[in-house]
Amino acid sequence: MYISNLRLQNFRNIPAKSFDFKNSINFIVGKNGSGKTSILESIYFLSHSRSFRSSQLNRIINHNADEFIIYTKAYNPDEITISLSRKKNSNNISKLNLEIQKNHTEITRNLPIQLINPESFNIINSGAQQRCKVIDWGAFYLDKTFLKIWQQTKFLVKQRNSALKQNYPYSYILSIDKKLCEFAEILDYKRQAYFTKLKPKIYEILSHFNPNLQLDIDYFRGWNLHKSLAQVLEESFNYDNKYKVTNHGPHKADIVLSVSHKPIQDIFSRGQQKLLICALKLAQGEIHNSENDNKCIYLIDDITSELDSIHTLTLFNYLKQLKSQVFITTTEKNKINEFIDTNSYILEI
């Protein structure tokens, strides 16, 4: 997948603009407030039907307008068009090849995105749910049945929590547990299948950033590895019932990062943590591209302020190997001069 043209109308501070891009590394250069990050945000919005900058979607609409529109022409390898519009206090309207979509799933499948921005580096210190999203992203693209299993599992956990809060009889909880265990086992299998591919790739790429970094990367499924979920739920029922929430299950899955059994945030410097996240993002893209004809697109916001020049160069070289389309923002052109080659495209705004 690559985007050849992007048109924005009333998206943040961009009233109406059309941009052409190359299927290579695209540098977006401009001062703070010029709209660089808004371009990345609009592409991300097209893929995910949400923003990575704000949950207040009305604020994304230009203050002089009542609606924003995002439109793109892309190739996969055939030409496709994707558009998304939103009016104030209304829902998103998504179109794929001019056809309105009931949900955004097909567009997300057509437009795989990896985002690297300053907030990406917080994943190590975030909760398990955020780290598990790394696995779920990859499993979604690796296995077309994953989404339905994930949705059903999420529904059953929510249903169980609701039953606990409303003091439903234990027999009713058991009926939910039976279904939950069935879907949880399938979900765990699919997550494990993706993690098995991801783990060695992270180690491989991280060694190019810093061969001296040693760490352990493990997948925790959300309950005791040596017990069935049914057994764990039965044993923990009194505790769950006391606090009115399900404390074990696939919703508690996590990627555990450690060094000699100590949390990585207690061992790695902030700079080393950034290298790990870059390796993680590159590993996801490489696995995706090897399993799909539809290559992943990278959105990278102001990376030169996050990494030194040596590690930034390593990141760029890996991105070139992936042959993915890349969008990179920067405030100063001189910061990227050493990374520009004949295939690069520079957009100054």
Curated annotation (Swiss-Prot):
One GO term of the biological process aspect: double-strand break repair
Record keywords, A-Z: ATP-binding, Cytoplasm, DNA damage, DNA repair, DNA replication, DNA-binding, Nucleotide-binding, SOS response
Chief place of localization: cytoplasm
Residue ranges that the Swiss-Prot or TrEMBL entry lists as coiled coil: none
GO molecular function, one term: single-stranded DNA binding
Gene Ontology cellular component annotations, sorted alphabetically: cytoplasm
Pfam families recorded: SMC_N (PF02463)
Compartments where located: Cytoplasm
Alphabetized Gene3D superfamilies for the sequence: P-loop containing nucleotide triphosphate hydrolases, RecF/RecN/SMC, N-terminal domain
Annotated function: The RecF protein is involved in DNA metabolism; it is required for DNA replication and normal SOS inducibility. RecF binds preferentially to single-stranded, linear DNA. It also seems to bind ATP.
Protein name: DNA replication and repair protein RecF
Source organism per UniProt: Francisella tularensis subsp. holarctica (strain LVS)
Top-level taxonomy: Bacteria, Pseudomonadati, Pseudomonadota, Gammaproteobacteria, Thiotrichales
Gene name as annotated: recF
